[in-house]
Amino acid sequence: MKKNFLIVMCLMMALMASAQDLVVCSYNIRNANRGDAKNGNGWEKRSVYMCQQIQFEDPGVFGCQEVKKEQIDDMLRLMPEYAYVGVGREDGKDGGEYSPVFYKKDRYKLLDSGTFWLAEDPTKAELGWDAACKRVCSWGHFKDLKTKHTFYFFNTHMDHIGVTARREGAKLIVSKMRELMKKNDPVILTGDFNVDQRSEPFQVFINSGFLNDCYEVSKYRFATNGTFNDFNPLNCSNSRIDHIFVSKSFKVDRYAIRTDGYWDNVEMYEAKPSPNAPMEVKLKEGVRRNPSDHYPVVVKMRF
């Protein structure tokens, strides 16, 4: 009897370990530039809130877009539990924006990684098709040290101008996924695709035969806005241009577009409370700001 009990307990523990949640995120953090700083949205200020937001969501792995090297350095300083893979799109080193994949160092072992350009020759740092900018897709092959599961994680930022570049870039990413995936390893794709759920590139991924849109297949969904906000908390749309796609082996439990913001200059104005407001509360008016001009997409799922 005791032996049977121990066997059952071991089986239950094994099942619990294999079904542990994986939280992933896609976040266009907006490149650091002087123009944003003049408008009150400088990286030095918003980066602190953005990293606090990421740490609260606690993703095991996440993809970012528009990231410059100095921003990566700041993020690693503020979130030392993470490491990253990826290179700058201009030269394959430190130049220009990255599309990095961040991962928790104590939870995941990096097995392999790489970057390819969304271009006719994906091995060269050059413009692809009708693109206005060089574009990359960075990827990592990871092993979960707790569950022993392995998976691929791809992250990209498609062109904002080139229609052909987006379509052909989507086809290239699907092709590279098929080329790299071994033994049907699960795969995750995050990114700012600069097109929404009604677009041709979106359909390329959906019709790949092995990818699902997390928004569509999630059991629970909290998405009251689109993913681009232009640094204005009042802006609203139903366009999701930041996406998370996963292979069909994943069970997606929760999907959210997180519209959290922060308050700036809260000491500038006295607020006029309503007649029913608690007298003990002294209110101030402030400026509501977003940590980026995109909202992060957060997904909770299981293998």
Where are these regions (language model features)?
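Bacterial Sec-dependent N-terminal signal peptides
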Residues: 1-21
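N-terminal, active-site-proximal structural segment of metallo-dependent hydrolase catalytic domains
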Residues: 17-79, 89-97, 171, 289, ...
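Active-site metal-binding loops of divalent metal-dependent hydrolases
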Residues: 27-29, 156-158, 192-193, 295
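Short, solvent-exposed loop/turn elements at domain surfaces
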Residues: 31-40, 111, 163, 222-225
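Structured beta-strand-rich core segments of catalytic domains in phosphoester-bond hydrolases
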Residues: 61-154, 158, 254-259
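His/acidic metal-ligating clusters that form di-metal
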Residues: 134-154, 166-205
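Metal-dependent phosphoester-hydrolase catalytic domains
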Residues: 164, 178-187, 195-303
